[in-house]
Structures are given as structure tokens and as C-alpha cells.
From Swiss-Prot:
Gene3D superfamilies: alpha/beta hydrolase. GO terms for biological process: killing of cells of another organism; lipid catabolic process. Local inflammatory effects are inhibited by antiserotonin drugs (cyproheptadine and methysergide), indomethacin, betamethasone, and antihistamine (chlorpheniramine). Belongs to the AB hydrolase superfamily. Lipase family. Disulfide bonds join C4-C87, C176-C181, C218-C227, C244-C268, C245-C293, C261-C266. It is an enzyme of class 3 (hydrolase). The keyword Disulfide bond applies. GO terms for molecular function: phospholipase A1 activity. It is found in: Secreted. GO terms for cellular component: extracellular space. This is Phospholipase A1. Catalyzes the hydrolysis of phosphatidylcholine with phospholipase A1 activity. Shows potent hemolytic activity that is responsible for its lethal effect. May act as an allergen. In vivo, induces local inflammatory effects.
Length: 300
């Protein structure tokens, strides 16, 4: 009995660029019908976005992130929709009981992303340095598994994987080979926003602890857990739109205010985090309302 079975046929992709914002779904077979995939070379930087448990690629938060990316840097954004294997189509009352099935599908979805990556590299001449993955919750571990698989296939490493509140249950006590891990890409950026659905275990090159684990504006701990878990997606979207929106202070320097930050000791959450010299764990104060920024206009 597997209520949320995985098969390549049930995974779909939405492909967005600045010129083409249609939310059409493609498969490995039909992807060649998309204008970008009719070309012999894809010159865009490519970003994969992968959702988590009981979610889908066409939810408002992920489409907003994709739009921010294509507006900002004319990225080619591939949203991976694995809703069947993520138990999204099951009845809401019993979905939670099926979590372990979705969790065990993450490696298979990761392998799928690696297959698409191989096609991008070998058929469309996209260098691995031009590809990053962003994943939320179970999608963060999926992205990690994709990072392991492309190395296994001899393609090298992705430039970056960004894990947005990686799922804690079934993963937080796993060793590196069974979860997202800092060796899965050249740079692995983790944004932690919850303690039960997510985890406060450090997993990446940099780990940002946003306000600890209970996000402002999300209500009481536990009751606001889903809101806190989802905030990671919203925070990162704002960090794409606003440079240095969220600045991380080294955990060892907490409670040093963000205003005292320099480029050599603090790190800005976002697409440019990897250009900062410091690695490790960072504390990130956040505001309770969008755009959540803590930098008061400061850029380091």
C-alpha cells in the first residue's frame, strides 16, 4: 500500500522566464515544445524550485518567488511539481498520516531533477556553475538528493543549493548521505524558521536562524508552526527583491545589532550570500510584516 506513489510520469514542470510567464505544465517528453528548449543552447542562469509535503508548484508563494527571480536576473526558472508523490491530492484529514511516504519519495524526485540537469548540461550546454536549486521543507532534502545524484553522474556540483526550512521529521537525525548536506553543492545556504516542521540542526555552509524558530506575526509557538515554516519561502523572495533585506549576525556575536555589521563578519541572506567570506551559523532578526527586512536600508 502506497497512497502517494512516485513515478516520473506524475512529475510536471512549470518553466518561467521574463518573456514567458505562462504557467503551463511540461513533462520530460513535452519540454521540447517550450520556446527555450527549442534552442540549441540555453544561455540563462537556471533555478529549480521544489515544493514540499502536500504542496504544489503553482501555489502563490512559489510563483511569487519565480517572478522575483525572472524580474531580477532574467533567470530560467523550473518549478518542479511532484504533488502526487507529496500526498497533496489525498484528503486533508489523512494527509499527515502519509508523511513518511512523501519523505521516502524525496530521493526519487531528486533523481528526476538530476535527469533534467543532465539534459540541460549535455544537450543545451548549460554549465553546472549556472544552475542553482531552491527547495522548501521536503523540497530542500529533494534538492540535496539531486546534488548527490549529479555528482554520482559525473556532472560535478551545482553552484548552490538553498534549503528553505528543511523538513525536520524523518531527516534531522540522519547523517549527511540521507538529508540535505553542505557537500551537496559548492555552497549550501539554509534558512531555518521553525523547530518542529523544520529543524534547528545546522545543515549547510551557512545556516541562518531567523528569529530563532518562532516567526513574528505567526502567533503562539506550535499553533503558528505552519506559518513559521512557510515564512522561509516569503523571506527568501523578499531577499531576492531587496538586496541585504536580511542580514545575519554570527551566532557567536549575538545579540550584536545588525547596524554594527561589516561585510567581513556578517552575511546577507539571498542570491549573493556566497560572495561573503564568513560561513557557519548566523542569527537573523526579522520584522513581523512583509518585506520583513532588518537592514533599514543598509547594504554590506
Amino acid at each position: 500500500f502506497n497512497p502517494c506513489p512516485y513515478s516520473d510520469d506524475t512529475v510536471k514542470m512549470i518553466i518561467l522566464t521574463r518573456e514567458n510567464k505562462k504557467h503551463d505544465f511540461y513533462t520530460l517528453d513535452t519540454i521540447k515544445k517550450h520556446n527555450e528548449f527549442k534552442k540549441s543552447t540555453i544561455k540563462h542562469q537556471v533555478v529549480f524550485i521544489t515544493h514540499g509535503f502536500t504542496s504544489s508548484a503553482d501555489t502563490e508563494n512559489f510563483l511569487a518567488m519565480a517572478k522575483a527571480l525572472s524580474d531580477k536576473g532574467n533567470y530560467l526558472v523550473i518549478l518542479i511539481d511532484w504533488r502526487v508523490a507529496a500526498c497533496t491530492e489525498e484528503m486533508s484529514g489523512i494527509q499527515l498520516a502519509y508523511y513518511s511516504y512523501a519523505a521516502s519519495n524525496t530521493r526519487l524526485v531528486g533523481n528526476y531533477i538530476a535527469t533534467v540537469t543532465k539534459m540541460l548540461v549535455q544537450k543545451y550546454n548549460v554549465p553546472m556553475a549556472n544552475i542553482r536549486l531552491i527547495g522548501h521543507s521536503l523540497g530542500a532534502h529533494t534538492s540535496g538528493f539531486a546534488g548527490k545524484k549529479v555528482q554520482e553522474l559525473g556532472l560535478g556540483k551545482y553552484s548552490e543549493i538553498i534549503g528553505l526550512d528543511p523538513a525536520g521529521p524523518s531527516f534531522k537525525s540522519n547523517d549527511c548521505s540521507e538529508r540535505i548536506c553542505k557537500t551537496d553543492a559548492h555552497y549550501v545556504q539554509i534558512i531555518h524558521t521553525s523547530n518542529h516542521l523544520g529543524t534547528l540542526v545546522t545543515l549547510g555552509t551557512v545556516d541562518f536562524m531567523n528569529n530563532g524558530y518562532n516567526q513574528p506575526g505567526c502567533g503562539l509557538p506550535l499553533i503558528g508552526e505552519t506559518c513559521s515554516h512557510t515564512r522561509a519561502v516569503k523571506y527568501f523572495t523578499e531577499c531576492i527583491k531587496h538586496e541585504c533585506c536580511l542580514i545575519g549576525v554570527p551566532q557567536s556575536k549575538k545579540p550584536q545589532p545588525v547596524s554594527k555589521c561589516t561585510r567581513n563578519e556578517c552575511v546577507c541572506v539571498g542570491l549573493n550570500a556566497k560572495t561573503y567570506p564568513k560561513t557557519g551559523s548566523f542569527y537573523v532578526p526579522v520584522e513581523s510584516k512583509a518585506p520583513y527586512c532588518n537592514n533599514k536600508g543598509k547594504i554590506i
